[in-house]
Amino acid sequence: MTVDLFAGISVSDIASGRQWYERFFGAEPAFLPNNAEAVWEVGEHRYVYIEARPTHAGHSQCTLFVDDLDGWVDPIVRRGIEPDERETYDNGVRHVTFRDPDGNEVSFGAAPDGA
């Protein structure tokens, strides 16, 4: 049985949100289901979407746990978006958090090398 996972992020304005997330992901959306949403495929059967929901904007959190943290984070930084926070936990897990213009958190995490 196949399951597709969609992680949603509420933004105040779809046009400005789409512009920021296109820069963040380095690509246009995979598809636009309607005038209020934009969807990016971040892995097989895994999607992050933004939705114009102004009263909810700024309260979303989304974490992508990846096998190559630098491979995801470094290109975002090269596109001009700096992380809000970088952490390494006692167990070696690394965590990098970005904030979109509405204040939503989009993070990447990775297991310690060799784990």
Could you say what each language-model-derived stretch is?
Residues 78-115:
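Vicinal oxygen chelate
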